[in-house]
Amino acid sequence: MLKHMFFTGGSVLALALTVLIGGGCSKSSTGPSGGTGGVVTVTGKVVGQNGQAVASVPVVVPGKPSTNTDAGGNFSIANVTTPYDISVVDAASKAALVYKGLTRTDPTLLFIGSTPGTSHTGNLSGKISGGEFTPNQPAADITRVVFASPETSGSTNTAVSGTFGAIPLNWFGPTATTGSLYALQFTADVAGLPVAAGYKGYGVRSGIAVNDGGTLTNQFDTLQTVTTSQFTGTITVPAGYALAAKLVYARVSSSAAITLFSDNTANAAFSYFTPGIPGASLLLEAEALKAGGGTAVTWKNGLAIGATGVSVNIVTPPELSLPVNAATAVDTTVTFSWTAMTGGVHLVIFQGGGSSPRYYVLTAATSATIPNMKPFGLGLPAVTVYTWAVDGFGPFGSVDAAAGPAGFITGLSIPLAASGDAFVGISASRTFTTAP
């Protein structure tokens, strides 16, 4: 299921995973009990991309016997010399992930492609009133509706009458989730951007519980008056990249954000109208693309509703160096290299077709080899075409920081993540053929 591409709530990218803003995004170079050159006991946890524990998978430190995670995803390996490499291997799903150069003793390791645990579902529908629903809203109006809880979120737009139909919800963890329903109405221009004095109403209704398999109908919310502010700034893109989109979200709680609009023009300077929701802040997402491959995304979080002169510098993604495209006779001794993404760590992706094993390497360095997983039944197949690419994640000062309690990727969407700025750079991809 994993594509070479991770992430975003935006309209330009259709990516499989999303990055966590904050939590693990620390610039510290070691973990809380990390160090260099010592002998330690590593006691960590393996989680899936949904944040749930992964049980019964082998965890390996070179030179040490492998150990399987327990039911809670926990593992412990004694007498480990720092810095160390550590791998999560699953022969059944034919995937292996290596973290390079760790010193922290309590890493959280993300098992890419895994979504363990029981998935719960539910939906809710209802009607929004107030604002410009008299009884129908004007044709130029848009009313966004969002349900959000600590475990999940979903959104839709209302019909002109204010009704909204089944917002689908999916979550892991508890069998019931309790959240709030948010609604925002505004008048938009032909491009879908809010106009001056365009915000007509905002409402929130809390304490809504959704049970697994539950369907809630007749959920309602009433809009109250909301003011309009102006939000301005400038985007700077890396050399060779073109600005593709700017998206703006209103963060209305720690677990909820309302998508305001997407501006898909290439204009670097922007001026938008935003809602004066008490206690809310703005999240700005800026996306840039490079002809021939390459994607850069930067998020500015915690911005004031009426912030002016905001400056966003999109970080330059990694660029592949060697081997050249369509290289042949590649084995686990061949070095793959790329340029660094400043302020981040690199996830190197080696992916073959069909049932071929997949390999992932998380490193702060600018080179890596394909992990030799033959002892675990995941040897590199002969004469097989593979694709490789490098994704950068930041801000992380080290792989230790990226192995913090929150990990570096979560199944939640960007607007639901913790406060803080973040960036991702996605390289172009190349192919190679393995050795006979």
Residue ranges and their predicted role:
Residues 1-23:
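Sec-dependent bacterial lipoprotein signal peptides
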